[in-house]
């Protein structure tokens, strides 16, 4: 009798596990500003097709009220589309997942504006043929990788939301944050030019750019962990993640690792 009860309990457990609804995460790479091929209405229509329970935005908590409504409606595609969507479907929940205080953090550590100043200096050196052949090859490849992405970003969103485009984004960002440091870490121009941080300390372009490189990893890894935390708190829900499409490859790569062995499915917005 006890054996029969035990078998029944095991069967019930197995069946309940099989019928437990999977959590779905749909990462949508976006263009932040309205364009003819992608605007807030485009994104709203995508959300209509998906019918998510949660929409996660590339913002930190400072942009939200205590009940997770926008403090202000931005003119970004995401802000306008989300506002329109929750007005129509008020039970849908918005959540932030961005690295907290991203911009202040970058300014305070000195990675901004040294990142932009550094890439401008590399470009200037290349234009007057002061880079070595190896350095020029790195910089030219970095610039060339942007061209196909500009073309893809001018097409329908399926064109910049797929593994092929993700791989181009990954290579382009690798060149920006890893390969360009082979120039900045070698050439004296980047060790002898400085920016003054808000606290009065000086930081070289070389050190500032290295911090920018490190922050690219830290930011994306943190965003993926935040997405995962929200997902695990809301089992069985359909969760849309909105991100600039250049972040998509990194976030998806991290989520694949974080969701391994869990009842969570990663999907494209156009998959049924």
Which residues fall in each region the model found?
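Boundary/entry segment of secreted carbohydrate-active catalytic domains
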Residues: 20-37
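Sec-dependent signal peptide recognition
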Residues: 2-8
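Hydrophobic, often amphipathic alpha-helical segments used for membrane interaction and targeting
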Residues: 78-232, 254
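Solvent-exposed loop/turn segments at secondary-structure junctions
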Residues: 31-34, 60-64, 100-104, 245-248
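Proline-aspartate-enriched helix->loop->beta-strand connector
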Residues: 51-57
């Amino acid at each position: 009798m006890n054996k029969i009860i035990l078998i029944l309990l095991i069967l019930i457990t197995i069946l309940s596990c099989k019928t437990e609804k999977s959590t779905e995460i749909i990462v949508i790479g976006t263009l932040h500003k309205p364009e003819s091929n992608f605007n807030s209405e485009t994104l709203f229509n995508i959300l209509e097709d998906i019918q998510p329970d949660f929409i996660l935005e590339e913002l930190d908590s400072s942009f939200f009220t205590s009940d997770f409504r926008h403090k202000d409606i931005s003119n970004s595609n995401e802000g306008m589309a989300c506002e329109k969507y929750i007005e129509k479907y008020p039970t849908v929940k918005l959540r932030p997942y961005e690295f907290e205080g991203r911009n202040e953090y970058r300014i305070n550590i000195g990675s901004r504006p040294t990142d932009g100043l550094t890439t401008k200096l590399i470009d200037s050196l290349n234009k007057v043929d002061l880079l070595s052949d190896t350095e020029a090859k790195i910089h030219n490849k970095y610039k060339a990788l942007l061209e196909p992405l500009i073309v893809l970003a001018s097409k329908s969103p399926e064109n910049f939301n797929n593994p092929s485009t993700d791989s181009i984004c990954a290579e382009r960002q690798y060149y920006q944050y890893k390969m360009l440091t082979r120039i900045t870490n070698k050439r004296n121009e980047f060790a002898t030019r400085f920016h003054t941080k808000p606290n009065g300390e000086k930081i070289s372009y070389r050190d500032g750019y290295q911090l920018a490189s490190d922050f690219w990893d830290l930011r994306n890894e943190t965003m993926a962990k935040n997405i995962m935390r929200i997902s695990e708190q809301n089992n069985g829900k359909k969760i849309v993640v909105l991100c600039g499409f250049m972040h998509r490859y990194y976030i998806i790569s991290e989520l694949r690792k974080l969701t391994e062995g869990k009842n969570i499915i990663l999907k494209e917005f156009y998959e049924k």
